[in-house]
Amino acid sequence: LNFERSFLFYYLYLPKQTFTPYPFETVVENEIFTEFIALTRENILQDYKLICESRQASLLGRRDVMGGRAKFGIFGDGKELAQIAMAKAFQKGDFRSGYYRDQTVVAALDGLTWRAFFSQLYGHADVAFDPNTAGRSMNNHYTTRYLDENGAWKSQTDTYNHICDLAPTGGQMPRSLGLAYASKLYRHNKELAHLANFSQQGNEIVFATIGDASTSQGMFWETMNAAAVLQVPLLTSVWDDGYGISVPVSYQTAKESISKALAGLQRTANEPGMEILTVKAWDYVALLETYQKAARICRQEQVPVLVHVQEVTQPQGHSSSGSHERYKNPDRLAWEQECDCNVRFKNWILTNGYATLEELEAIDNAAKKQIREERNEAWEVFQHSIKTEQEQAIGRIEAAAQTSNASPELLKLADDLRREASPLHRDATTAVRKALRLLRFEESTTKSELDHWLKENKAINEDRFSSHLYSQSAESPLKVAAVGAQYDEKPAMVDGREVVRANFDALFTNDPRLVALGEDVGQIGDVNQGFAGLQEKHGKIRITDTGIRETTIIGQGIGLAIRGLRPIVEIQYFDYVYYALATLTDDLATLLYRTKGGQKAPLIIRTRGHRLEGIWHSGSPMAVVVHSLRGLHVCVPRNLTQAAGMYNTLLRGDDPALVVEPLNGYRLKEALPLNLGDFCVPLGQPEVLRLGTDATIVTYGSMCRIVLEAAEQLAQIGVEIEIIDVQTLLPFDLDHTILASIKKTNRVIFADEDMPGGGTGYMLQQVMDTQNAYRWLDSAPRTISAKAHRPSYSSDGDYFSKPNVEDVFEITYELMSDAEPERFPKI
């Protein structure tokens, strides 16, 4: 490095490529690109301006929390300089997958205005003002809205892409692997070249960011190992400030250094792995050099890189929840002031003569003024929409008071609402709801106006805070119509596994975007042969084996789905879903919701469950996933033909989903359809498997066969059971098929293989609460479930742990005996 008064130059030699590094110019010399980075006085002072703005935003943000304007604040102060350097290595089409510390890099890439920064801090529930999360995430969670207002994809190659940040520490890592893996697929699978809005020949790299304490999480280590195995362009920055809130690194990390702890993954001349670089958070020149080098290795060589950014400071501690003076001694606090990256950068500028002290103070003062102005604008706009509602509510309550017997109470409500200096949306709604209580014995035009206002306001707030749990686009899988399976007059009867395999073959033949991955999926075609022979036909790059790492299998799928591919990833057995549950519930299930329709990841998770053998190969934890994975569709096919039809439906839609295939159905014979890949099972529409008049049994999955067999035995004694296969738990019975059946039979039993109160409890709530079916019952509803323990091993263990034919028969008989004891005496 050579220093001059006006310019700082350094050189990097790169292989010839089609991309143009950002933000500097590139020239061609003898088939070699020479990247000539010229940092002018103007560049340097622009960087100084940005770090001053970012720091001031952090300081004012904390002040607003302490002053009551915002509920909570967490900021990126102390990391400004490293993020400036990272931004200079970013190119359009690249991705950032991070957490709540990255405000400076987002601002450097023009993805953040400071007004939007404060709008998010205040919780402004409007995409126009908080385009990142529409007030649904706390502050410092950033999003590139890669979906248009109709939910359709926009180009990802002409923007700097930020995947909506996560607060659960380490949660951003699994999807980072998938985002980087997508670049590998786009680079090596030429059949994807037409998807130019998603990739330019796989030249995109992924910048993941994580705090040093969060590197203790298992998903971080799983991601690092998988990235090194897969050799994907993942550039991970670890912001190391030496603490996890109050817990020092000595309690967190082996050797008190994540770069030392990861040294075994360092690549060598003979062994692939990852590149590990270290740099100080306050060293401007070294940061620039390190990030340019890291990005070059990552982009050109397709090698993962970890940049361990050391000696990061926390000027305000972890968050607004408390002061770091509680757990840092005076020497540490003094060191943090001395090594503050903004202070060091200022001194470096002065030492090298790029500006005078007066010039830097002028920049600092201008930054403070700008941040104050944008913060005040954000607050004013935030309050305006709320105060409009406040005034509307006050006016309507006072109007109602003029003719009401409860006038004093109503006027007090209006006066209390008027005195709210910094009201929230809830305040007007609360006041109107209380007013309507007071008016419950009266009828008037003003009461009707209050009621009308409340209903309109409820719809507005439903959109503000509860929309986009599922797709609202034209591609919603709920809009995919049913297409029946077609058969020969004498169809071939094959194992169920052959039906789903043939269907996957048809799908992969017709859509190059499809990718399947998971343990044993590739070479042997999965443990139940649903992909047998398909890797050989469609290639290893499309049907791929993975290690035993459920969390990053899901992460790979999320990243691929975000980048325009259609992955089907496998959790080998349903019991193993717990390994991946955090990533499923925190990231995948919430992505569309927490961006208010700005981002989606239409991933399909394939697994198999219900009953086979033993504690960990026969689980059916449906309540766990139903209550953890709102935002996904949960499909529970009774056989492999139904499963195939569900895959066909889901691949025509744009929501994520979990499909639980019946584990004991792969070798049962099924008719092979003719229209493979085309027949569709609609979501949320149960199927009546057997007509009856005496009672309705609602079930799904492998239990369908059990219940059907019991129904035949019950018919022999004069009990006719109507059997309904719900087919999907999310969504559940959209057309109220179950209600129609109960109106006929007046009795209902809910049966599944989950533990007591699990899936049966969910179905009971849906039918009794949502469908109000209780009005049609002549007998109390009953449930049939597995025992409260995990299923025991062996056929005997299955029989005494899971519901069986005799259980279904006897509980149904008890129901009939209670109703007609003479006809059905107790057994």
Question: Across the structure, where does each feature detected by a protein language model lie?
Answer:
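Cofactor-binding active-site loop characterized by glycine-rich and histidine/acidic residues
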Residues: 56-237, 242-244, 248-266, 271, ...
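Active-site phosphate/pyrophosphate-binding segments
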Residues: 599, 609-613, 617, 622, ...
